[in-house]
């Protein structure tokens, strides 16, 4: 089966191919003889009732000196594609939300979109953990300064993070006696006008913030533990963390069993769970990464498995709701 697959992503010229999961997917698509088309968010638009895309044929090579080649662009109905992979990175802002509306309309016109646009919109990567409280650390979401201060007093050590960012951006670690608590809260909440998430600090982050990839709700049997650099508590590769491949623990598998069926039901077919110690901290649905690092450390073709799943899913899907 040869599919026409669109990949909606941030500019390909700016990616670091050795650690880019979207690039791993592109290599796998090409290896399986699919036609790959490249789009950026601004390439998708609504004209009257049709969703159109300015798309270019894309060829890729695992070569850091020249990793892509693009044809001239053509404007076509988006549903001229068979499948579209939505791989736009956060921030999760209103531009992202509007893009999911366009993709949802394209879906109704016959395009198979992965992950499902309505679920990308609904499943905020921080807030979605609230559906699984038995898996998470003590958590608070609020814009109220007094409520945040009370939570910090109760938990002694917390992290506070925005709901729409990525890669460890604007995450603060606070202790109960930190003199900066008021200014951090005021800044993060925009003086009480913006919701933020606070979670009990998990000391095991020093041993690694684990990323687990799930395909159709089933975990890859390995995790990428991202170990924070000295002097930092954030286990993000973009912040200098070191990636170390490990096998899943029994607790990791248990958390995946709790979350996986809901992901499958929502059409969230490619997801990255973040687990620190024994606790689920985030559910990454927009453009989870970690595949290239895991494939380099273990004899596993995660991107190939995902594309094989897409082929089967597309072949058996006759009515995309």
From Swiss-Prot:
Source superkingdom: Bacteria
Matching Pfam families: GSH-S_ATP (PF02955), GSH-S_N (PF02951)
Biochemical pathway: Sulfur metabolism; glutathione biosynthesis; glutathione from L-cysteine and L-glutamate: step 2/2
Residues annotated to bind ATP: 151-208
Annotated positions binding Mg(2+): 282, 284
PROSITE patterns per record: ATP_GRASP (PS50975)
EC number(s) stated in the UniProt entry for this protein: 6.3.2.3
Gene name for this UniProt entry: gshB
Protein known as: Glutathione synthetase
Gene Ontology molecular function, alphabetical: ATP binding; glutathione synthase activity; metal ion binding
Entry annotated with the keyword Cytoplasm: no
Cofactor comment: Binds 1 Mg(2+) or Mn(2+) ion per subunit.
Cofactor section: Mg(2+); Mn(2+)
Family listed: Belongs to the prokaryotic GSH synthase family.
Cross-referenced InterPro entries: ATP-grasp, ATP_grasp_subdomain_1, Glut_synth_pro, GSHS_ATP-bd, GSHS_N, PreATP-grasp_dom_sf
Database matches in HAMAP family: GSH_S (MF_00162)
GO terms under cellular component: cytoplasm
Sorted UniProt keywords: ATP-binding, Glutathione biosynthesis, Ligase, Magnesium, Manganese, Metal-binding, Nucleotide-binding
Reaction it catalyzes: gamma-L-glutamyl-L-cysteine + glycine + ATP = glutathione + ADP + phosphate + H(+)
Claim: Repressor is one of the keywords in the record: no
Stretches assigned to the ATP-grasp domain: 125-311
């Amino acid at each position: 089966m040869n599919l026409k697959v669109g990949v909606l992503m941030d500019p390909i010229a700016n990616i670091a191919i050795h650690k880019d999961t979207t690039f791993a997917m592109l290599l796998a698509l090409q290896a399986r003889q699919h036609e790959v088309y490249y789009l950026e968010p601004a390439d998708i638009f609504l004209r009257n009732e049709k969703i159109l895309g300015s798309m270019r044929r894309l060829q890729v090579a695992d070569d850091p000196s020249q990793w892509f080649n693009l044809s001239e662009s053509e404007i076509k109905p988006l549903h001229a594609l068979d499948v579209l992979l939505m791989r736009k990175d956060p921030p999760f802002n209103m531009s992202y939300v509007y893009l999911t509306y366009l993709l949802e309309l394209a879906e109704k016109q016959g395009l198979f979109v992965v992950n499902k646009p309505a679920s990308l919109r609904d499943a905020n990567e921080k807030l979605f953990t609230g559906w699984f409280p038995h898996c998470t650390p003590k958590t608070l979401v609020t814009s109220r300064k007094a409520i945040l201060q009370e939570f910090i007093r109760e938990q002694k050590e917390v992290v506070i993070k925005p709901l729409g960012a990525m890669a460890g951006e604007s995450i603060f670690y606070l202790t109960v006696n930190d003199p900066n608590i008021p200014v951090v809260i005021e800044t993060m909440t925009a003086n009480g006008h913006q919701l933020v998430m606070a979670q009990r600090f998990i000391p095991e982050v020093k041993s690694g913030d684990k990323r687990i990839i799930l395909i159709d709700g089933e975990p890859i049997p390995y995790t990428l533990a991202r170990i924070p650099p000295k002097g930092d508590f954030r286990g993000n590769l973009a912040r200098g963390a070191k990636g170390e491949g490990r096998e899943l623990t029994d607790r990791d598998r248990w958390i995946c069993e709790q979350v996986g069926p809901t992901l499958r039901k929502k059409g969230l077919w490619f997801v990255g769970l973040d687990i620190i110690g024994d606790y689920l901290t985030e559910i990454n649905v927009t453009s989870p990464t970690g595949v290239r690092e895991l494939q380099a450390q273990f004899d596993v073709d995660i991107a190939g498995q995902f594309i094989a799943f897409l082929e089967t899913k597309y072949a058996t899907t006759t009515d995309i709701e």
